[in-house]
Amino acid sequence: MLTLSDFDFDLPPELIAQTALPERSASRLLEVDNTNPSAPPRLIDRRFAELPACVAPGDLLVFNDTKVLKARFFGRKASGGKIEVLIERVTGERTALAQIRASKSPPPGTTLTLADAFDVTVGERVEPFFTLHFPDNCLVLIERHGRLPLPPYIEHAPDAADETRYQTVFAANPGAVAAPTAGLHFDDAVLAALEARGVERATLTLHVGAGTFQPVRVENLAEHRMHSESYELTDALVEKIAATRARGGRVIAVGTTSMRALEAAARDAQAAGRPLAATRAETDIFITPGYRFRVVDRLVTNFHLPKSTLLMLVSAFAGIETIRAAYRHAIDARYRFFSYGDAMLLTRRDDAAEATHGGA
């Protein structure tokens, strides 16, 4: 049985990208050709701008169109004590769930002043979050007064460049507290080249939660509990997936968030004995080696943290040894890692179930 230690690796800290490159599609792309099960994977170093040459007319790229909220606030209690608030999810026009860092957990009814701009009232606890009641439309107040919640491994304070580059060019639906980072490499030129090549596009929405950065704290992966995130698939997306299948094209997920939404919806549909359909739901799907993929044929993704659930996901998709070889190559070739880093293009290995944990 696989354990957490099976997904550890040594990463030189200087390979953690701290800023975005001047041009989105100037990032590197490691194409991993693992289609021959009797041979080692072929690792091809490219620029991301070459992606259109790596996909075929009739393929379908599925993007996550979530938009990152300016979800981080610094503030104070009425007593003057300092607090830090990270909005996890907007739940209504004037309500949200949030993490609160303070010397002592604020009880219901506590008033907090955020960004020296407005007050919120603490409501009921919804573990591990607090309900916050805003005085006005919370999306407006968050956008006006909040700070971009850069990942914990990015060491600088967010600036004007981050406000552009930590969003995808197709971000449309506010609600995430972390970017769907595989999408950050796409610029208008790459999207136009994909269209010219006859590659279809579709979108879904999965609002990435702060739990995406939470470490796995148990060695036995069966004991890990994933955070829950909300997602939505539309009729238009489902129809495009069916049309792609009918013409022999491949479904290519842009990012692990798109992957998780597609696979969660397909798994739940299969369990209910129905075909994939438009849906709005929550998912805490945890994809590990042994999982049987139902929708996605290829995956565009960044390089992930050691011992992370996302590293487990890509290992399930492409094969553990394939991913280990690709990561060794990426480190040796000085690829940039994590949110502002470079990308990989993976193909599903139907024999990737090198271990049986994960099933379903």
Curated annotation (Swiss-Prot):
Protein name: S-adenosylmethionine:tRNA ribosyltransferase-isomerase
Similarity comment: Belongs to the QueA family.
Coiled-coil intervals: none
Keyword entries, A-Z: Cytoplasm, Queuosine biosynthesis, S-adenosyl-L-methionine, Transferase
MF GO annotations: S-adenosylmethionine:tRNA ribosyltransferase-isomerase activity
Cellular component annotations (GO), alphabetically ordered: cytoplasm
UniProt-listed HAMAP family: QueA
Intracellular or extracellular location(s): Cytoplasm
Primary enzyme class: transferase
Name of the coding gene: queA
Claim: Ubl conjugation is one of the keywords in the record: no
Catalytic activity, as annotated: 7-aminomethyl-7-carbaguanosine(34) in tRNA + S-adenosyl-L-methionine = epoxyqueuosine(34) in tRNA + adenine + L-methionine + 2 H(+)
GO biological process: queuosine biosynthetic process; tRNA wobble guanine modification
Pathways involved: tRNA modification; tRNA-queuosine biosynthesis
A Pfam family the protein falls into: Queuosine_synth
InterPro entries xref list: QueA (IPR003699), QueA_dom1 (IPR042118), QueA_dom2 (IPR042119), QueA_sf (IPR036100)
Main location: cytoplasm
Source species, domain of life: Bacteria
